[in-house]
Amino acid sequence: MSISSKTEDSDIRSSVMTDHGPSGMKRLAGLSLAALGVVFGDIGTSPLYAVRECFHGEYGITASAGNVLGVLSLLFWALVLIVGLKYLTFIMRADNDGEGGILALTALIITHSRNRGYERWLLVAIGLFGASLLYGDGMITPAISVLSAIEGLQIIAPAFHEMVIPLTMLVLAGLFLFQHNGTARVGALFGPIILLWFIAIAILGIIEIVKYPQVLQAMLPWHGISFLLGNNLKGFTVLGAVFLSVTGAEALYADMGHFGRRPIRITWFLLVLPALLLNYFGQGALLLSSPGEAHHPFYGLVPSWAMIPMVLLATSATIIASQALITGVFSLTQQAIQLGYLPRLTVTHTSARHMGQIYVPAANWSLMVGTIGIVAWFGSSSKLAAAYGVAVTATMLISTILFYYIARDLWKWNPAALNVMITFFAAIDLSFFGASMSKLFHGAWVPLAVALVMFTIMNTWKQGRKLLMRQLQDRTLTVDEFIRSLALQQPQRVPGQVVYLTANPDVVPIALLHNLRHNKVLHSEVALFHFSNERVPRVPNSRKIEVDRLGDGFTRVIARYGFLEYPNISQVLALANQQGLNFKPEGISFFLSREKIVAGEKTKMFPSRKKLFALMARNALSATAYYDLPSGQVIEIGVQVQI
């Protein structure tokens, strides 16, 4: 699943919605092709392992005619109901100013939900855990995708078996080491390569279906129902492997803001769904005629002369699918920073044209270590499949829950109809989640453990910042009180323009009080800058800056930024000066407070979490670097705070 945003894409998206002429159709086609490389890479490479795991994996079932038709029926209806009906028809209606994804949906609930108190806290916690699951998915998906593609080498020649793991680790290492360069130059190739991939897998499927057309009767739902009823618990556990066919469906919703609903829907129904079904049914036809091919039915469709080109194409497709997920983790990390769930981290823009193309070193190296470690630990894509899926099923279930509250509280949908719909989708989600959880002790715990760690980190940072702000607020006074005190006892004023960054626009920054207490002077022009992180993707320039003249040489500037934007001090100064601030950038001194966190007995936070918060605070990117302040004009004042 990936979450990303590009300013130019938003403009194109808008024009596609309004322009139905030749130019509009051309733009729609271009956007649909681009969506192929970003949105559909994950779900598009699932044929490499989904059918195989149903019949050959650790939880596989015998490849009899009834079982093959039953599994194909479940695959068909999973794609139709989960992707086509649930996501493309309903979930994609829930957007936060055009943006999709778990965090965007959670922010929408915080802003508009009528729930208060414990219920609202629980919804936010569920949404935050859903976002945390992406980090676990971000380690598993590249590992299983690239590994399953390169495993085709051992089909070409069994002697290549020993090379599979080292080659996979080498490809993954190269992928992560390349991230700092961005994808601007090679990104244009993603769409055409994935297009070629879908055409190739569709042709491979058609060739086998023509030989065994009886396989098409698997579209009848009775075959799937009969399979589940006839195989009892074994059939239920196979659902976990069936679900591998829809991993990546969440990306359709998460990347909605990147490409828009229409291009994603058109691409899915006209190309992706037909290609996937043709390949899955082709693999089924192969198993009906040759059950012995269950060890790798995908490569069983490939003629011997095309095996090497197909392995190369599959590897390229899985690298692109992994790239989309890595980019999604970068974007999610940036959103979490902006929404106050993670400390400030280095975020590098890799493209001057596209604001959505970013690189987050901390996230990149964490994913690299985790992904390569997972490949080394599990050793095969079949073993990895047991760990795959549980994070995605949990995310889908969480999306269903959050969607219910949006439809109920924000859209005021008919309660009876909404309850029926949500019960139907929740039953599907719970079935797949239960089947995936049956593999808990065979690797499914890995992404859950990663998600739990990330949830703890994000929740600890959010709670720690609240406690820190409360402690600082108790040690200062309000801006109004401070301005009134100046009229009673005016300190010595010295010429100069200074900016104090403040986390709370209503109270005096600690740095200002310490400067006044120790230096006994106050500058003639003082601006209090507050960066407000809004729960919307973007804030237009017309509403971004609020300038408030407080009197006695004081001005308060509130800069509002969305969770997909990056704070920019130069932009803030320019917009504020347009409203009469008249601060000269080269002559400003920036005063910051740097808090030293000390674990104490003043708050109820667990000692271990206090230590974790203090550790994150010490290693967070400095405000000077994060806001790109001119280092030669910055004065930092230290303050020790006990929590």
From Swiss-Prot:
This is Probable potassium transport system protein Kup. The gene is kup. Residues 1-20 are annotated as: Disordered. It catalyses: K(+)(in) + H(+)(in) = K(+)(out) + H(+)(out). Residues 1-12 have a biased composition (Basic and acidic residues). Keywords: Cell inner membrane, Cell membrane, Ion transport, Membrane, Potassium, Potassium transport, Symport, Transmembrane, Transmembrane helix, Transport. The chain crosses the membrane at residues 28-48, 65-85, 121-141, 158-178, 187-207, 224-244, 268-288, 301-321, 358-378, 384-404, 415-435, 440-460. Its main location: membrane. GO terms for molecular function: potassium ion transmembrane transporter activity; symporter activity. It holds the Pfam family K_trans. GO terms for cellular component: plasma membrane. The lineage of its organism: Bacteria, Pseudomonadati, Chlorobiota, Chlorobiia, Chlorobiales. It is a multi-pass membrane protein. It comes from the Bacteria. It is found in: Cell inner membrane. Belongs to the HAK/KUP transporter (TC 2.A.72) family.
